[in-house]
Amino acid sequence: EGCCSNPACRTNHPEVCD
């Protein structure tokens, strides 16, 4: 949800989905 489902944000913050 949020940054986790946003490809650009996920690229910059890969640990957010961890």
Curated annotation (Swiss-Prot):
GO terms for molecular function: acetylcholine receptor inhibitor activity; ion channel regulator activity; toxin activity. The cysteine framework is I (CC-C-C). Its main location: secreted. This is Alpha-conotoxin Lo1a. Alpha-conotoxins act on postsynaptic membranes, they bind to the nicotinic acetylcholine receptors (nAChR) and thus inhibit them. This peptide is active on neuronal nAChRs alpha-7/CHRNA7 (IC(50) of 3.24 uM), alpha-3-beta-4/CHRNA3-CHRNB4, alpha-4-beta-2/CHRNA4-CHRNB2, and alpha-4-beta-4/CHRNA4-CHRNB4. 10 uM of this peptide inhibits these receptors by 85%, 40%, 19%, and 13%, respectively. One of its GO terms (cellular component) is extracellular region. InterPro entries: Conotoxin_a-typ (IPR009958), Conotoxin_a-typ_CS (IPR018072). Disulfide bonds join 3-9, 4-17. It comes from the Eukaryota. The keyword Transport does not apply. It is found in: Secreted. Negative results: does not show effect on the muscle nAChRs alpha-1-beta-1-epsilon-delta/CHRNA1-CHRNB1-CHRNE-CHRND (adult subtype) and alpha-1-beta-1-gamma-delta/CHRNA1-CHRNB1-CHRNG-CHRND (fetal subtype). Belongs to the conotoxin A superfamily. It comes from Conasprella longurionis (Cone snail). Signal peptide: none annotated. Keywords: Acetylcholine receptor inhibiting toxin, Disulfide bond, Ion channel impairing toxin, Neurotoxin, Postsynaptic neurotoxin, Secreted, Toxin.
